[in-house]
Amino acid sequence: MDHRLLEIVACPVCKGKLTYDKDRQELICKLDRLAYPIKEGIPVLLEPEARSMSMDEGR
């Protein structure tokens, strides 16, 4: 994941900052507790495609 891209992308729900989870290949919004998948190197920033994170994840 290009770190320059992380500087400009935002959560489509709250417009907050996203962090990159290399192991899961996801972009994480800690505010909304949503994880957006990265498929074939392309972030899929669609709310229906995001998975809800448990309360224990992302701590």
UniProtKB/Swiss-Prot annotation:
Superkingdom field: Bacteria
SUPFAM superfamilies, sorted: Trm112p-like
UniProt cross-references to InterPro entries, sorted A to Z: Trm112-like
Gene Ontology cellular-component annotations: cytosol
Pfam families in the record: Trm112p
Family to which the UniProt record says this protein belongs: Belongs to the UPF0434 family.
Listed name of the protein: UPF0434 protein VC_1876
